[in-house]
Amino acid sequence: MTYFVLFLGLCFVLGGLAVASNPSPYYGVVGLVLASVAGCGWLLSLGVSFVSLVLFMVYLGGMLVVFVYSVSLAADPFPEAWGDWGVVGYGVGFVVVLVVGLVVGGFVGSLDFGVVTVDSVGMFSVRLDFSGVAMFYSCGVGMFLVAGWGLLLTLFVVLELVRGLSRGAIRAV
């Protein structure tokens, strides 16, 4: 179980690296899906199934819509893949920064691996993450509205950035 959680953590970091290394949007969406699946699987293996499901729906429902619009509007004749020198340079730079941060922070020698689940203290009649479901929908209404408007604003910003000088449907004939 510990190795599985470490594998999911590694997949999460590699997925984030695949998005952050600035490939073409065609390839960046694959890194986003890998990171979201690995992160939600990581939470699921630790016993937080409801929060994992909510985050998975937010990631795939919100951010993938933005990436789909970016891919549809950014028609590159020669898209940058992960094997191009610029993307590989970004990836190597991120890995070097991560390793230097781990060494300087002193985390390399003191890595104790262990897995602790959410309800490992004893037997509960209701799991701990399901007790927060009511809080999501009662006190979290404002947060959901702000997050929805934020995703809509992000969609419009990405559409405006990708559109360029073509002026969309409002063009002078």
Curated annotation (Swiss-Prot):
Membrane topology classification: Multi-pass membrane protein
Keywords attached to this entry: Electron transport, Membrane, Mitochondrion, NAD, Respiratory chain, Translocase, Transmembrane, Transmembrane helix, Transport, Ubiquinone
Cellular compartment(s): Mitochondrion membrane
GO MF annotations in UniProt: NADH dehydrogenase (ubiquinone) activity
Gene Ontology cellular-component terms listed: mitochondrial membrane
Domain of life: Eukaryota
Stored Pfam families: Oxidored_q3
Transmembrane segments: 1-21, 27-47, 48-68, 87-107, 139-159
Top-rank EC class of the record's enzyme: translocase
EC number: 7.1.1.2
Matching Gene3D superfamilies: NADH-ubiquinone/plastoquinone oxidoreductase chain 6, subunit NuoJ
Reaction catalysis annotation: a ubiquinone + NADH + 5 H(+)(in) = a ubiquinol + NAD(+) + 4 H(+)(out)
Function: Core subunit of the mitochondrial membrane respiratory chain NADH dehydrogenase (Complex I) that is believed to belong to the minimal assembly required for catalysis. Complex I functions in the transfer of electrons from NADH to the respiratory chain. The immediate electron acceptor for the enzyme is believed to be ubiquinone.
Family: Belongs to the complex I subunit 6 family.
UniProt protein name: NADH-ubiquinone oxidoreductase chain 6
Primary gene name: MT-ND6
